[in-house]
């Protein structure tokens, strides 16, 4: 069973990741910095992944034994809102902020990824990590560009599903 004492070692990096992401908010389907940050962390943790849906990421952590596939999803984008606070890690991007907690969702999923990667496969099945862009949509201009690239103009979820995010998944949990 996972208890607080078994995961406390993850907290400093979780906070660091959260603050970095909070400072670098990006709107739907524009999450280039966020996506690169996630990819860098997954590389550090030795977790294979693939980039999909313009800025989305699908990563799988395989267990040593056959079993079900459980997906965990975190949304990545920020909102077009000016942050008005004096946090030391406030948004550095004028007119954009993580007002919905997506920065925390990504930080938490990265911590879960690190934890599961550290188990060295000592579990059944597979854990699929879904880092989804544009959960609350994107600008009409951006959606048109995504559609022209072969993605879905309906947003991040439809684009991720079209890229196979839920293929073989038996259960899915999401942060929001």
What are these regions (language model features)?
Residues 1-99, 103, 107-128, 133:
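Acidic/His- and Gly-rich active-site-bordering loop/insert found
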Residues 87-97, 104, 116, 121-176:
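Histidine/acidic-residue-rich, glycine-tolerant segments that coordinate divalent metal ions
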């Amino acid at each position: 069973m996972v208890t607080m004492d078994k995961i406390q070692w993850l907290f400093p990096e979780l906070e660091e990741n959260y603050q970095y992401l909070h400072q670098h908010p990006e709107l739907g389907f524009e999450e280039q910095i966020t996506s690169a940050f996630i990819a860098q962390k997954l590389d550090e943790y030795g977790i294979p992944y693939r980039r999909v849906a313009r800025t989305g990421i699908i990563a799988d952590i395989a267990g040593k034994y056959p079993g079900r596939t459980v997906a965990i999803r975190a949304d990545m984008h920020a909102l077009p809102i000016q942050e008005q606070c004096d946090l030391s890690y406030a948004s550095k991007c004028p007119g954009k902020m993580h007002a919905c907690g997506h920065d925390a969702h990504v930080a938490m999923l990265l911590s879960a990824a690190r934890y599961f990667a550290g188990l060295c496969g000592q579990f059944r099945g597979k854990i699929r990590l879904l880092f989804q862009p544009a959960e609350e949509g994107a600008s009409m201009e951006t959606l048109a560009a995504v559609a022209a690239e072969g993605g879905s103009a309906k947003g991040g979820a439809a684009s991720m599903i079209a890229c196979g995010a839920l293929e073989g998944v038996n259960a899915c949990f999401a942060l929001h």
